[in-house]
Swiss-Prot record:
The lineage of its organism: Bacteria, Bacillati, Bacillota, Bacilli, Bacillales. Belongs to the IspD/TarI cytidylyltransferase family. TarI subfamily. InterPro entries: IspD/TarI, IspD/TarI_cytidylyltransf_bact, ISPD_synthase_CS, Nucleotide-diphossugar_trans, TarI. Keywords: Cell wall biogenesis/degradation, Nucleotidyltransferase, Teichoic acid biosynthesis, Transferase. The record marks 14, 22 as: Transition state stabilizer. It holds the Pfam family IspD. Its EC number is 2.7.7.40. It comes from Listeria monocytogenes serotype 4b (strain F2365). It comes from the Bacteria. It catalyses: D-ribitol 5-phosphate + CTP + H(+) = CDP-L-ribitol + diphosphate. This is Ribitol-5-phosphate cytidylyltransferase. The record marks 159, 216 as: Positions ribitol 5-phosphate for the nucleophilic attack. CTP binds at residues 7-10, 80-86.
Length: 237
C-alpha cells in the first residue's frame, strides 16, 4: 500500500508570538495545512493520508480538515516528540491498524510546504517503490560554508555537489523503521533527518528534483512570501 504522512507535529516557535502552531495559520483564507492536504487528496494512488498532529491540537486539526475537505482516506493521528519519532509513530499506527507488508511505502511531507506539485509527489512514489528511500532536493544556489566551532570556517564544499533538502521524503516503511530501531538512543537524539537514518544503514537515497517555490513556511517573512505566491497565481489564472 501507499501512504502519505503530513508532518504537522511541530509547535512553530520561530513564527513568533502567534496563538497556534504555524500549520494552522491562515493562508489566503484557509489554514496552511489545508492547502497542503489538498495536494495529496488529488493523487489517487494514496490508500491512506495520515496527518500527524500534536496531541493537544488533534481535535483542531480534525475540525479544520472536515471544514474544507471530504476524503475518507484522511486519518489524524498523534505526532511524536521530534520529526523522526513522528514518522515512526505513523508507521506504528499503520502496522497496528492496517498491517505492514514488505512493499508498503510512505511519502512524508511538511505540513507547512503547501506548494508541492503533482510531479514531485508522483516521482517520490515511483522512486520509493523502486529504491526504498527518497529525498526531494534543489541545487544549492549559494555557496555553503561549514564551521565546526561556529566561529571560523572549517570547510567550503564544492557547490556543484551541494543540494538543499526539501520534502517529501519517502521510504519503504519496514526498512526505515527497522533502521531506526537499530539506532542507539544517542543517535536517535541527534539525528534530525530520516534520510540520514537510511544513509547510516548503507542504503542509497534517490534524489527527486524539487522546486524553488516549494518553500517551508517557518517565519513571518515566509508567510508573507507564501501569500505573495498565491496572489500571483490568482492574478495569472
Amino acid at each position: 500500500m501507499i501512504y502519505a504522512q503530513i508532518l504537522a507535529g511541530g509547535k512553530g516557535t520561530r513564527m513568533g508570538n502567534v496563538s497556534m502552531p504555524k500549520q494552522f495559520l491562515p493562508l489566503n483564507g484557509k489554514p496552511i495545512i489545508v492547502h497542503t492536504v489538498e495536494k495529496f487528496i488529488l493523487n489517487t494512488r494514496f490508500d491512506k493520508i495520515l496527518i500527524s498532529s500534536p496531541k493537544e491540537w488533534m481535535n483542531h486539526a480534525e475540525d479544520n480538515i472536515k471544514k474544507y475537505i471530504s476524503d475518507d482516506r484522511i486519518v489524524v493521528i498523534e505526532g511524536g516528540e521530534d520529526r523522526n519519532e513522528t514518522i515512526m509513530n505513523g508507521i506504528r499506527f499503520v502496522e497496528k491498524t492496517y498491517g505492514l507488508t514488505d512493499d508498503d511505502i510512505i511519502v512524508t511531507h511538511d505540513a507547512v510546504r503547501p506548494f508541492l506539485t503533482h510531479r514531485i509527489i508522483e516521482e517520490n512514489i515511483d522512486a520509493a517503490l523502486e529504491t526504498g528511500a527518497v529525498d526531494t532536493v534543489i541545487e544549492a544556489l549559494d555557496t555553503i560554508v561549514e564551521s565546526s566551532n561556529h566561529e571560523v570556517i572549517t570547510d567550503i564544499p564544492v557547490r556543484d555537489h551541494m543540494y538543499q533538502g526539501q520534502t517529501p521524503q519517502s521510504f519503504n516503511m519496514k526498512k526505515v523503521f527497522n533502521h531506526y530501531q537499530n539506532l542507539t538512543p544517542e543517535k536517535k537524539q541527534i539525528l534530525t533527518d530520516a534520510c540520514k537514518i537510511c544513509l547510516l544503514a548503507g542504503d542509497d537515497v534517490k534524489l527527486v528534483k524539487g522546486e524553488i517555490f516549494n518553500i517551508k513556511i517557518t517565519t513571518p517573512y515566509d508567510l508573507k512570501v507564501a501569500n505573495a505566491i498565491i496572489q500571483e497565481r490568482i492574478a495569472n489564472d
